[in-house]
Amino acid sequence: MSPPSPARRSSVLSLPLLLLTLTAAAASEEEFTEELLLRPLPDRKALSHFHFRSATPPPTAASGLHHHIFPKAISQLVQRFHISELELSFTQGRWNYETWGGSDPLSADNAKPPGVELWAVFDLPFADIDATWKNLTHTLSGLFCASINFLESSTAFSAPRWGFKSNEGNLRYGALPREAVCTENLTPWLKLLPCRDKAGIASLLYRPSIYKGYYHSQKLKLTSTQTGGIILDQSLTVVLQPNTSKSKQLHSTGGKLQPSWSMEHLFNRNLLGKCLVSRSSRIFVEIEKGILLKSGSEVSWRNKFFELSTAPDRVLKELDHLEVQSSSLHEYDLSNYNDDKPLDVGIIWKLPLIWSCSPAPYNARRFLMGSGNERGSIALSFLSTDLNKQLPGSSNDCSIKAVVLQLFPWYVKIFYHSLQIVIDGSSKAASEVLDMIHVTPSEDKLSPGTLEMLLRFPCSMQSATLILDFDKGFLHIDEYPPDANQGFDIPSALVSFPDFNSSRKYPEMDPMFVSPLLENFKEDNVVKSYTEVLLVPLTTPDFSMPYNVITFTCTVLALYFGSLLNALRRRIGEEECRLRKAAVKPALIPLLLARLRGHKVDPSESESSPASPVGLKLLVKVALVAIVAVVFHYLSNS
């Protein structure tokens, strides 16, 4: 056989190189970025916001449905259920809007209600949306190891028109306020990352440090278009309490110092480098506007009040929608750090400093009124934060819009005509405050009630209260959840302010600078906030009654039949013979001892034994048990 020609050998050798080139080109179309934002909070806590983005282009004939970085499960989810947008959040704790802020991009987009919240927009005909929603909940339940499948019931989800997000009727929204959040939900969430938690910024997610925080919310958001492909945004927001036992608490001036902290101090983990497949890996330390005003330094990372443990690679100024500097971002690029040069950025406080975060226009609260298990009232209160005074050109005749979305289970029967509005202590007609309202009444055991309202408050208003009366329905015993005596949780109400947005601008940022986190901050997100979960007590049956009846009945029957069968099967003559033998046997030993000693013993005394009335006792016992059984039967029937 002749050896292959040089041209053929070169073609054979170039084939693997060509395959590697095609694979690298396909992988280069998919992108992954990882970012972390750290921020000190006024109440001596620290905020950590992890953000990961995975993007894939639309499938082509060459690439098909194969992925190299993007998670395949998410791609199949989008294609199977025709999803245009989807957002799923798992939250433990409640965001403190008064202290941690309510009008900045981070709180407006990442502060979520307790439990599970899911909404999705489908690219399907209206007739197929509900069935697709039910299948989607089961798929997400298995994917994230949670009870999301409870949202498949028509009594657990709704289709809001404009109170949540403007849509054409293809949006579905549901919430499970009682759903617990644990590591079983975080593990599948991390598996969607190309490096998981083995490398990069995700390696800081140490479970004991994450779940001991005051607030924990993990979110997954999908956006799918025909031209842009699929974009998967994963974010994790945690509020942690730095350990103050090792830090100095009091300053020589008498003030209380903020606790100093670092990444290793917060997460008990070292950051050794970036994820190898990530396009960019950055860490930002945000210094808020309140700190900048008090410290008198705009961009300095070292001043008389605080100092960052590591000099930043870049400093960015943020401008809010009023073109006013709101904060500064100190950037650290992880490509400049490795195992030999690890990064442990933190903040060291030198002087006491008190500041406040930017609040929402109103702090919204919701609570119950009334007493008893038959009826009550739900009150939604608004307390002004005087944010309107900071707006240019505000006058006494101006107004602030507020959109309210509330979901009510079918067993909370709302009387929508009973709406009362009280502003600054005086009652107002609904027509004076309501610009628009949409009500979807609930149907018993079929669908929940939905209330959407567009309110217009005067800028000079300090407080307002909306009151709705309701009746409490009755449930079948099979419809009660575990621990029903605690009460029933009503999902949080959503309050948004269309006149206020939380967008930020970065005029000094390079156009080639790629940061999905800052791109989200640039979007015109409406300022919104969630109220508390409402706990409504309902009349519950005595679930222990069947157990008590069964236990008592079985005990009585066991005593009755046991004694009756014992009396019927036992012979009285055998009992007397057994007693006589028991009395004779102990007397043999004294008789033998007496004969050995030479004493005379009367045999009649040793053989005589007292006759016990055994038969009479048994008859009395059987009669008593029979009387008890008859009395119990009579009382149970009556």
Label each region the model flagged.
Residues 371-408:
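Short beta-strand elements of extracellular/lumenal beta-sandwich folds
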Residues 399-417, 424-426:
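Proline-anchored loop/turn motifs at beta-strand termini and strand-loop-strand connectors
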Residues 28-362:
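Extended, low-complexity intrinsically disordered regions enriched in serine/proline/glycine/threonine
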Residues 118, 122, 126-167, 171, ...:
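Serine/threonine-enriched low-complexity regions used as flexible
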Residues 13, 543-559, 612-626:
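Transmembrane alpha-helices of multi-pass eukaryotic membrane proteins
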Residues 7-27, 624-629:
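Cleavable N-terminal signal peptides of Sec/SRP-targeted secreted and luminal proteins
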Residues 194, 427-471:
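Extracellular adhesion/glycan-binding regions together with long Ser/Thr-
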Residues 17-41, 632-638:
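N-terminal signal peptide
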